[in-house]
C-alpha cells in the first residue's frame, strides 16, 4: 500500500537497504542518506511538512533542513516572528551570505521561501569561530508557515532559566539533518558560547541546541575539523560541538535599531501552523 507520507528519493534524499548502510547507521531496514559523508539514518521529511505542502506552504521549525544559496545545506534552529510581524528563522551565520535565497529541503518542490537578511560572521576558527555565528532569515508569508514543533522536536522557551538548565553537565540535545537527534553533557559555557559533547557534523550547522524544550543555542560546528561524528559506530569518539548561546543572540537583536529583522523575536503560538 502506498504511503503518501513517505517521500521518495530526491535531492539530498536517498533511501538505501544495503548491508553496509544498515551497519554504519546501526539501523535495520531502510536507511535515509541526506548529507554526503554522514552514515546516520537521517531524519525523514515529517508528516506535518507534507501536509503543509498540500496547502502550498513550506513549514519551518526547529530542525528543518534548509538550502541556503546555491551550495550550502544547513539546519534551521528556530522559527517565529519579530516585533514588526515578519516571519523569521535563525540559523548559523556561516551557512550563507546576506541576500542568499533559502528554501526547505523537506519541501524543495516549493522553491525559494526566504532570504538571509542579516548575519554576524564567525570571528575565527574553533571556539573563536562560534562567536556571533548567526544568520537571520526573513520568510515569505505567502509561501512559508512556522511552528514551534517539527519532526518531534519542540521549542517551548528561549534561553537559560533560573532553574539551572545552563549548568555544566546538563544534558543537551540537538536536531540536525546530518546526524539527527543526538544528546550529551554540556562541557563549557560563557555568556556567548556553549560547548557540549554532542554528535554533529557538516549539515548540522544552525541546528537547535536544547535543554529539555528550551532553546539554549544555535549549533556552529565542531571544536576542530578533526573527528566529526559521521556514524553511530563512533560511540563517544568525536569532537565536541560549539553553539552560539540563545541569550546572546536575542540580546544582540533586541539591542538593535527598531525595524531590524529579528528584533523582538517570539515563538509561534502552540497551535500554529493554522493552514486551513
Outline where the language-model segments fall:
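Protease-domain processing segments flanking chymotrypsin-fold serine proteases, especially trypsin-like
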Residues: 1-87, 100-115, 267-276
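C-terminal cap/linker of serine protease catalytic domains
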Residues: 112-116, 123-126, 139-157, 221-276
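A short local loop/turn or secondary-structure capping micro-motif enriched for an aromatic residue
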Residues: 97-100, 204-205, 224-227
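Serine endopeptidase catalytic core focused on the charge-relay Asp
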Residues: 68-190, 211-212, 275
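FAD-site-proximal beta/loop scaffold in flavoenzymes
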Residues: 195
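Catalytic nucleophile loop of clan PA
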Residues: 199-219, 223
